[in-house]
């Protein structure tokens, strides 16, 4: 008879981190979609993840990441089970353990909107509350509109050591209602700057009268494919069409690097952003879903 155990940790050991990363890679190969977000992977690799492990005969069969989310929106989590150890109750056990530790409403991301995840969420009484779309467009075989920068606005690239504070200010204002992006700290920003993909030449800043009012941060994946990583416009600069301008500047940059295509993520409920991206030739490619449970009784 196999031995099962659930283990909670505020920081996994290096061997445990390696096992979880291998588990996530196996799930990606099997499902065709990565089971963990960038933020979850960053905290995992840094040894700072609040983690739940589901063990079977001493082997990590499943992993859950818990983000206590001090923004008041409730805790959030992500769950992955090794493909070879599914349908044995690991996912359900991890989900219920997350709910207990959340001590309030729990939000859980299901990357890829896969049927087994939807079935588990329904069985656990969780409601579908948010849909994140991945959209894509080709770059080399599809023309891009030219860029016209508004009068009084200048564009330059990010300078590490100079622009962090201003960037965080605009990011916080632009995403004040966004539970993940708007709460970024200097530590979060520096964690991305330390990643091998970070390139300040791909982070474009818009300024007016010497003050930052918007940005477009691009990213290049090894596939290779480019990404509209994040576009933010300060509320004081709304109405200038700056979101479209910054998006196009980044798309031209990625095209000129020779990348065949570009991707982005956008909330399905963000109708203005969806209209913008569709007008620029993006189409829907994949879906992530957030489920929410009520607090435990």
UniProtKB/Swiss-Prot annotation:
Listed SUPFAM superfamilies: Acyl-CoA N-acyltransferases (Nat)
GO MF annotation terms: mycothiol synthase activity
PROSITE patterns noted in UniProt: GNAT
Domain N-acetyltransferase: 7-156, 153-297
Binding site for acetyl-CoA 2: 231-233, 238-244, 270-275
Cross-referenced InterPro entries: Acyl_CoA_acyltransferase (IPR016181), Bact_Acetyltransf (IPR050832), GNAT_dom (IPR000182), Mycothiol_AcTrfase (IPR017813)
Keywords, in A-Z order: Acyltransferase, Repeat, Transferase
Physiological role: Catalyzes the transfer of acetyl from acetyl-CoA to desacetylmycothiol (Cys-GlcN-Ins) to form mycothiol.
Quaternary structure (record): Monomer.
Name this polypeptide is given: Mycothiol acetyltransferase
Organism for this UniProt entry: Thermomonospora curvata (strain ATCC 19995 / DSM 43183 / JCM 3096 / KCTC 9072 / NBRC 15933 / NCIMB 10081 / Henssen B9)
Organism classification: Bacteria, Bacillati, Actinomycetota, Actinomycetes, Streptosporangiales
């Amino acid at each position: 008879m196999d031995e099962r155990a659930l283990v909670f940790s505020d920081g996994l050991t290096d061997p445990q981190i390696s096992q979880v990363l291998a588990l996530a890679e196996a799930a990606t190969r099997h499902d065709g979609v990565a089971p963990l977000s960038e933020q979850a992977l960053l905290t995992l690799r840094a040894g700072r993840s609040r983690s739940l492990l589901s063990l079977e005969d001493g082997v990590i069969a499943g992993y859950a990441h818990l983000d206590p989310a001090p923004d008041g929106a409730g805790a959030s989590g992500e769950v992955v089970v090794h493909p070879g150890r599914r349908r044995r109750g690991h996912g359900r056990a991890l989900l219920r353990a997350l709910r207990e530790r959340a001590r309030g409403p729990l939000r859980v991301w299901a990357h890829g909107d896969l049927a087994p995840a939807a079935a588990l969420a329904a069985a656990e009484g969780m409601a579908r509350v948010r849909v994140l779309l991945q959209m894509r467009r080709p770059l080399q075989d599809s023309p891009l509109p030219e860029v016209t920068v508004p009068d009084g606005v200048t564009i330059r690239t990010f300078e590490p050591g100079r622009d962090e504070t201003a960037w965080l200010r605009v990011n916080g204002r632009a995403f004040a209602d966004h539970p993940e992006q708007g709460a970024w700290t200097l530590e979060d920003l520096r964690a991305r700057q330390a990643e091998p993909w970070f390139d300040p030449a791909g982070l474009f800043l818009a300024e007016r009268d010497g003050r930052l009012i918007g940005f477009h941060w691009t990213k290049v994946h090894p596939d290779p494919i480019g990404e509209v990583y994040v576009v933010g416009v300060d509320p004081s600069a709304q109405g200038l069409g700056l979101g479209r301008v910054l998006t196009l500047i980044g798309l031209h940059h990625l095209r000129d690097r020779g990348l065949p295509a570009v991707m982005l993520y956008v909330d399905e409920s963000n109708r203005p952003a969806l209209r913008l991206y569709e007008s620029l030739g993006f189409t829907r490619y994949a879906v992530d879903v957030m489920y929410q449970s009520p607090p435990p009784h």
